[in-house]
Design a protein with these regions (language model features):
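Beta-rich globular "head" domains
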Residues: 36-73
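Solvent-exposed, flexible loop/coil segments flanking beta-strands in beta-rich domains
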Residues: 2-47
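Short, surface-exposed beta-strand/strand-loop-strand elements in extracellular ectodomains
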Residues: 64-88
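C-terminal interaction-tip segments
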Residues: 3-14, 120-139
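Noncatalytic modules at the cell exterior or secretory-pathway interfaces
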Residues: 100-127
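An anionic, turn-rich surface loop/hairpin at beta-sheet edges
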Residues: 81-103
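Short, surface-exposed beta-strand/loop "edge" segments at domain boundaries and coil↔beta transitions
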Residues: 26-34, 66-69, 121-131
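Residue-level recognition of well-ordered beta-strand positions that form the cores
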Residues: 59-61, 118, 134
């Protein structure tokens, strides 16, 4: 089996930011889905491609199961081991714009800079995850 995933869907995009939505219904086996694919985003007007994404705001709902397994993570993709950006549990809204957002990891390792939604292997079949995130485009 596989998770039932709707999206990611770009809700709004300009040269400075992008808003992306994804809905994931777990099959109980966990999984990783590319949420923010930097290579698929619109380049700047001068042709410069997006290199990284910085998290500005996130609306989320991670519900179902017995409560101990209804969490998800946003990670920055890296072939040396993904780099956690933020963990999500329950439902809520976080706004990081006051201090410029959660910056992208720009280390010199093999960072691919895509953002992944990670659902744990402990998730119950039927757990629902809805994430809407606003990212700053970093060139």
């Amino acid at each position: 089996m596989a998770d039932t995933v709707t999206g990611p869907t770009i809700l709004q995009q300009n040269d400075k930011r992008v808003v992306i939505k994804i809905v994931n219904q777990s099959d109980g086996s966990g999984g990783t889905t590319v949420f923010g694919d930097v290579s698929a985003l619109d380049a700047r007007e001068d042709g410069t491609a997006v290199a990284h994404l910085g998290l500005l705001r996130v609306w989320y709902s991670c519900q179902g199961g017995d409560g101990g397994d209804s969490y998800a993570r946003l990670d920055e993709e890296d072939s040396d081991g993904d780099i956690p950006i933020i963990g999500l549990t329950g439902a809520g809204y976080w706004d990081f714009r006051e201090f410029g957002g959660i910056p992208a990891d720009k280390s010199s390792n093999s960072n691919q800079s895509d953002v992944n939604l990670v659902v744990p292997g402990a998730a119950d079949d039927g757990n629902m995850y809805t994430i809407i995130a606003e990212f700053q485009k970093i060139y």
